[in-house]
């Protein structure tokens, strides 16, 4: 599958929510059901480990980032085995560069085709530092930029920033 062509075709790629049981614990059974639903509904892909799945899944006390990414990838592969079609698996990628590189490598190991890169970890850093960060990630995995609005914890970026961002080889889209 050519990812850029797939994205330009205008597919719906929902952000997967995190399924919890009545005790607020991760429910693998319900998480699989959500993934199967999105595939059966005809979505063009799935964004996993992003805002709807909760950033907190990365925290050591939860330690759910790896299992959530792996489960979604396994379930998508199993569902598409019977009726193959193009489907974009996009992993959320967060944190400063060291963490983001590790998350990108993990996503690639599970067969994800792109990373939705959050820049929320860069609260005050110069824009050129953030561009360099994204360029580092884009060398590993195709990047979907993620703009977090200031009203929900993001920051304003200049036109020059977005211009440089869009020129990074490996950036395939920007979610706004």
Which residue stretches match the model-derived regions?
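Active-site/ligand-binding-proximal alpha/beta "capping" segment
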Residues: 163-175
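Active-site beta->alpha loop and helix N-cap motifs at the rims of alpha/beta catalytic domains
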Residues: 1-159
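Short, surface-exposed loop/turn motifs that are enriched in glycine and acidic residues
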Residues: 151, 175-176
